[in-house]
């Protein structure tokens, strides 16, 4: 294999439509292009002219797996614009809603999408034939995450109970306690999940990432905090555009993100873990140590293990919130719209999301900017592939493509119903 061009005309399980192009010349990697068409650009356009209070419901439709991330980013940005002060009781309910999303999303990715790659199965259906109890446990764990979203958010997919200022309706303590035993089971299942993920075989592949994440002084980040990196960034969401920029590339409709004056960066579970390890619970740290996960991770293939730890954290955090729950005096606070610009960053399961809205005096959105984690990671995925390909270049074409699938899947780009996300066509020089 001296010269070879590999074209992948369609990538499923990414945020929109995409393709992969790999060029090998004289047994060396000549070019890597991950081409992604990104739906959120359309959402920015048709948000213009809409009332501010429609933003949470509209942006939730960007993703069916992590709608809460887009809703939370929208409500926080609007509340930032209007100077709204949110009571702690509502803030805690929002964290609980986010716990549900992390549990269901991480579980879906870990067991249904990524584990089959490591275990040599085409998909989870084939995996279930040999590991039925593992898959049954995964389905129950995911359902518990969905149940939390349903209870707090009004429904599992595209929740309808979230509003700028709080919620339309809040659960009673009895409502939450009905889920308590299930979440206790989920906590134990999450421990087993982290151990299962750590038992998989990982290639020796490490990258010097600039990790970027929301960082909160007191808690593992969901909704609030500063934007920080392991290489010196420490800014508020209002300063995002001064430090990060998006750029057009010829081979993709999606925008590449980079740090100004530097280059690509990493968002997602590994970035969060590396920057927020000390905010994890004692049990999370204990399990991480037991399975050989240090305080920092730079092997992207081990993102599946970090997702296991974050699933455990989400279960523990959900139990803590329920234990201390007190119904707010009102489901929401009053919002007084004004001419303003609002900014927010929250942590989707896949990584940090940035929202910026400019609103006029009538409360209508004049401009919107949404930067999802997949677009932020696109340049880093290409970098991973460029550095990883030389380690698998002598494998058969089938094995090489399979390894590339794993490398892309580390980032959980998005979910679709496709069985495989690479349809391979080879053009020989």
Task: Give, region by region, the residue ranges found by the protein language model.
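Active-site bordering "gate/hinge" segments
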Residues: 1-352, 372-429
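A translation/RNA-centric and nucleic-acid-associated enzymatic feature enriched
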Residues: 350, 355-357, 367
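Active-site catalytic microenvironments in core metabolic enzymes, especially phosphate/sugar-handling
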Residues: 363
């Amino acid at each position: 294999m001296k010269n070879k061009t590999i074209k992948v005309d369609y990538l499923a399980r990414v945020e929109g439509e995409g393709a992969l192009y790999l060029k090998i010349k004289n047994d060396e990697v000549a070019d890597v292009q991950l081409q992604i068409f990104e739906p959120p650009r359309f959402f920015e356009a048709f948000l213009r002219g809409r009332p501010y209070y429609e933003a949470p419901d509209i942006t939730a439709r960007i993703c069916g797996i992590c709608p809460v991330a887009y809703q939370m980013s929208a409500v926080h940005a609007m509340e930032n614009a209007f100077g709204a002060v949110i009571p702690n009781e509502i803030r805690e309910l929002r964290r609980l809603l986010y716990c549900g999303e992390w549990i269901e999303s991480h579980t879906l990715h870990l067991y249904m999408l990524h584990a089959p790659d490591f275990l040599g199965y085409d998909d989870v259906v084939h995996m279930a034939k040999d590991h039925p109890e593992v898959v049954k446990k995964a389905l129950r764990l995911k359902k518990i995450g969905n149940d939390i979203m349903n209870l707090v958010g009004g429904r599992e997919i595209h929740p309808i109970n979230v509003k700028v200022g709080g919620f339309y309706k809040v659960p009673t303590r009895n409502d939450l306690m009905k889920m308590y035993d299930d979440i206790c089971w989920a906590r134990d299942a999450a421990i087993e999940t982290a151990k299962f993920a750590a038992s998989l075989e990982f290639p020796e592949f490490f990258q010097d990432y600039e990790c970027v994440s929301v960082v909160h002084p007191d808690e593992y980040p969901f909704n609030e905090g500063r934007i920080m990196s392991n290489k010196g960034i420490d800014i508020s969401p209002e300063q995002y555009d001064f430090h990060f920029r998006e750029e057009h590339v010829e081979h993709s409709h999606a925008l590449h993100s980079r740090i100004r004056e530097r280059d690509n960066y990493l968002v997602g579970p590994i970035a969060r873990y590396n920057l927020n390890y000390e905010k994890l619970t004692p049990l999370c740290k204990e399990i991480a140590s037991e399975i050989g996960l240090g305080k920092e991770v730079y092997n992207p293939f081990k993102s599946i293990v970090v997702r296991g730890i974050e699933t455990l954290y989400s279960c523990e955090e959900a139990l803590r919130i329920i234990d201390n729950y007190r119904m707010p005096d009102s489901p929401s606070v009053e919002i007084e719209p004004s001419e303003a610009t609002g900014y927010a960053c929250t942590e989707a399961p896949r990584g940090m999301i940035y929202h910026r809205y400019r609103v006029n005096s009538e409360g209508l959105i004049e401009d919107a900017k949404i930067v999802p984690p997949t677009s932020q990671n696109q340049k880093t995925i290409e970098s991973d592939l460029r550095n990883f390909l030389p380690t698998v270049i002598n494998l058969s074409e089938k094995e090489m493509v399979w390894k590339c699938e794993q490398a892309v899947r580390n980032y959980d780009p998005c979910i679709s119903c496709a069985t495989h996300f690479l349809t391979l066509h080879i053009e020989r020089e």
